[in-house]
Amino acid sequence: QVLKYCPKIGYCSSKCSKAEVWAYSPDCKVHCCVPANQKW
């Protein structure tokens, strides 16, 4: 999942939990973690 930016409900982290979507965005050096049950 490649995003233009990490959404406000998401956060930048080197490791996301299994309940989250692992995404990439230019404003995160590592991963952008987004809760899988959220609409964004």
Swiss-Prot record:
InterPro entries: Meleagrin/Cygnin. Keywords: Disulfide bond, Pyrrolidone carboxylic acid. The keyword Disulfide bond applies. The modification Pyrrolidone carboxylic acid is found at residue 1. Disulfide bonds join 6-33, 12-28, 16-32. Belongs to the transferrin family. This is Meleagrin. It comes from Meleagris gallopavo.
